[in-house]
Amino acid sequence: MERARRRGGGGSGGGRGRGGKNVGGPGLSKSRLYPQAQHSHYPHYSASATPNQSGGTSEIQELASKRVDIQKKRFYLDVKQSSRGRFLKIAEVWIGRGRQDNIRKSKLTLSLSVAAELKDCLGDFIEHYAHLGLKGHRQEHGQSKEQVSRRRQKHSAPSPPVSVGSEEHPHSVLKTDYIERDNRKYYLDLKENQRGRFLRIRQTMMRGTGMIGYFGHSLGQDQTIVLPAQGMIEFRDALVQLIEDYGEGDIEERRCGDDDPLELPEGTSFRVDNKRFYFDVGSNKYGIFLKVSEVRPPYRNTITVPFKAWTRFGENFIKYEEEMRKICNSHKEKRMDGRRASGEEQECLD
């Protein structure tokens, strides 16, 4: 009896231990998902010391965080700093519908220079998504949902497998692009399946595996996040704010003894009809550039023109302005001549 009680007590204690570890579903520990909260608003991030292969630690400091909620997902955008410089960590946290569903997390890490390119790419995808929405509304108006579903299933092609746990259904690719920097590639794919449209951002290594890279951790595995298309604008706006607030500081730290930064001209803006155009001069490790933004809420499109291309841009603007002015004047003169001829004919008839 005493042996049975000891055996039963040991089993009960073990059960309590296992139950404490498996909060949220089997194989997922709440303490692993929310290790040591750095602040109450973003409790899912670990401490700033990251282990490396040699057994030491690389101090990583968190500078800023933003959170974007889209449908059943939360996206955390954190600007961090290591001994190599500043970088952006994007974490996607997905919570299932039921209590028994696991909380899944995926992440993406990229330098601030790549984040700036990602911001520009997002502008293109947002514009394309808006165009698809208008086009789809015109095409599907008057058709039943069943007809639309059959048509989409007929024209959709299965996609190659992606990261584990994505649970993606067969889908079609609506737009694709990529960013290549150093030995990494970032693929952006706007896709559609029976759940809706989404943007998948995937990072791959072009050479080498298992390296400790710029971000202070192993880069041997691909990283992927999936962003619902409806939230691309909000996600892009949060990204823009972080880049504007912390991108320039990263640039200054990378200059490493260069001369004092140049005093750049102040930005300007003007309004035309329902749009506003912004002109902002900036600089990074690649040189000086002019950022031209066209804003029509809730949309914002931006192009970046390097300093060496300003002269050619200016020449082309002046050229087309002069040509268009000549065309308009010629058209106006033709209309005036037509009116004069019509008036003379009327006088002859009188």
From Swiss-Prot:
<feature type="DNA-binding region">
    <location>
        <begin position="54"/>
        <end position="296"/>
    </location>
</feature>
<dbReference type="Pfam" id="PF04845">
    <property type="entry name" value="PurA"/>
</dbReference>
<dbReference type="GO" id="GO:0032422">
    <property type="term" value="F:purine-rich negative regulatory element binding"/>
</dbReference>
<keyword id="KW-0238">DNA-binding</keyword>
<feature type="compositionally biased region" description="Basic and acidic residues">
    <location>
        <begin position="137"/>
        <end position="149"/>
    </location>
</feature>
<feature type="modified residue" description="Phosphoserine">
    <location>
        <position position="166"/>
    </location>
</feature>
<keyword id="KW-0539">Nucleus</keyword>
<dbReference type="GO" id="GO:0000977">
    <property type="term" value="F:RNA polymerase II transcription regulatory region sequence-specific DNA binding"/>
</dbReference>
<dbReference type="GO" id="GO:0045202">
    <property type="term" value="C:synapse"/>
</dbReference>
<feature type="modified residue" description="Phosphoserine">
    <location>
        <position position="163"/>
    </location>
</feature>
<feature type="region of interest" description="Disordered">
    <location>
        <begin position="1"/>
        <end position="59"/>
    </location>
</feature>
<feature type="modified residue" description="Phosphoserine">
    <location>
        <position position="342"/>
    </location>
</feature>
<protein>
    <recommendedName>
        <fullName>Purine-rich element-binding protein gamma</fullName>
    </recommendedName>
</protein>
<dbReference type="GO" id="GO:0005634">
    <property type="term" value="C:nucleus"/>
</dbReference>
<feature type="region of interest" description="Disordered">
    <location>
        <begin position="136"/>
        <end position="172"/>
    </location>
</feature>
<dbReference type="InterPro" id="IPR006628">
    <property type="entry name" value="PUR-bd_fam"/>
</dbReference>
<feature type="compositionally biased region" description="Gly residues">
    <location>
        <begin position="9"/>
        <end position="27"/>
    </location>
</feature>
<feature type="compositionally biased region" description="Polar residues">
    <location>
        <begin position="47"/>
        <end position="59"/>
    </location>
</feature>
<keyword id="KW-0597">Phosphoprotein</keyword>
<comment type="similarity">
    <text>Belongs to the PUR DNA-binding protein family.</text>
</comment>
